[in-house]
Amino acid sequence: MLDIRLFRNEPDTVKSKIELRGDDPKVVDEILELDEQRRKLISATEEMKARRNKVSEEIALKKRNKENADDVIAEMRTLGDDIKEKDSQLNEIDNKMTGILCRIPNLISDDVPQGESDEDNVEVKKWGTPREFSFEPKAHWDIVEELKMADFDRAAKVSGARFVYLTNEGAQLERALMNYMITKHTTQHGYTEMMVPQLVNADTMYGTGQLPKFEEDLFKVEKEGLYTIPTAEVPLTNFYRNEIIQPGVLPEKFTGQSACFRSEAGSAGRDTRGLIRLHQFDKVEMVRFEQPEDSWNALEEMTTNAEAILEELGLPYRRVILCTGDIGFSASKTYDLEVWLPSYNDYKEISSCSNCTDFQARRANIRFKRDKAAKPELAHTLNGSGLAVGRTFAAIVENYQNEDGTVTIPEALVPFMGGKTQISKPVK
């Protein structure tokens, strides 16, 4: 959520930033009009309360002097009714303002390129060279079924489209990837490992910006009023919701693996085969809490943490800056890492790393103190995929496939695969 003072002090800047995202800047005028009404109501209410205090003193004085106080008692009742009415009006305006403010996205950093879609994202780095095959490479969805690593048909029978059973060495590879990523982040990158709740309440979803605007993208357990998480970013960021982080704690770095659940509303017909776009998938997440002056350097570091996984696995990738028309709701700046997939003959997103500045912290009331005597300030929050496990799985299967139908296991994963160096079709 944005600071109301930005609307008051820099309305033109806020309008231009909102317009860059393709949203209607008139919302700024709506907020300012409501803010003016609110301030007038507060002023009028304060005057009434001051008058009520004075009338209360007059009543007490008249009673002490045994004088008739009916007129001032009547005024007191009228003032009480008027104050209740003003408070009700103020509450209504506050709700309207909050309802609008919570749907306005974060302000985009000045160095984010302008554009309308992912076609306008800007490549800033490329690592590795896509492999030239001496044979016709297969898509991962064909490879995993031939090697009995996955079963899409039975998953469709049990759950519907966009689900998968990972079987045999497919399940082992998925587990190995998660263990490898978590181990890398905790032992080399300085993150604290967390196991997170995968059902969360509405306040939690509000804190990170999924609610109220993106409810259609979520799965909800209606009876309990809980939501399945779309990413571990949600519970990890809300760890400090409504708390003041004590001096000396920041920077705080969390990592955690979870299942992620997404309805994929609006993605009908896109990536309908394989592991790229599922309703349920595994992901290792990184979340950081930083002092404001440190968050931009933290974004660079967190992105290199994700890149280190791809490089150690030997997977060609590129880094792009998301343009103004493609960046997420809560982010001020986002880097996407895209891995090379031979089946697409293109790069596909495998990680998003974002600086959300104080946007989520204001929604979730996450503050910190620089020292014991200091006034609490809003922290900056960052999040990044480290990495999307299913897409990493797909990238390994496609990039490490062999002409005889086997898949070579990247060297970094061999210890996590029980020493296994190759995946072959099971005998049975």
UniProtKB/Swiss-Prot annotation:
- UniProt function note: Catalyzes the attachment of serine to tRNA(Ser). Is also probably able to aminoacylate tRNA(Sec) with serine, to form the misacylated tRNA L-seryl-tRNA(Sec), which will be further converted into selenocysteinyl-tRNA(Sec).
Looking up InterPro entries in the UniProt record yields: aa-tRNA-synt_IIb, aa-tRNA-synth_II, aa-tRNA-synth_II/BPL/LPL, Ser-tRNA-ligase_type_1, Ser-tRNA-synth_1_N, SerRS_1_N_sf, SerRS_core, tRNA-bd_arm
- One GO term of the biological process aspect: seryl-tRNA aminoacylation
Which family does the record assign? Belongs to the class-II aminoacyl-tRNA synthetase family. Type-1 seryl-tRNA synthetase subfamily.
Description of how the protein assembles with itself and partners: Homodimer. The tRNA molecule binds across the dimer.
Q: Where does L-serine bind?
A: 231-233, 285, 385
- Location(s), subcellular: Cytoplasm
Provide the protein name: Serine--tRNA ligase
- One Pfam entry for this protein is Seryl_tRNA_N
Keyword vocabulary terms for this entry: Aminoacyl-tRNA synthetase, ATP-binding, Cytoplasm, Ligase, Nucleotide-binding, Protein biosynthesis
Q: What is known of its domains?
A: Consists of two distinct domains, a catalytic core and a N-terminal extension that is involved in tRNA binding.
Q: Which gene encodes it?
A: serS
Q: Does the keyword Protein biosynthesis apply?
A: yes
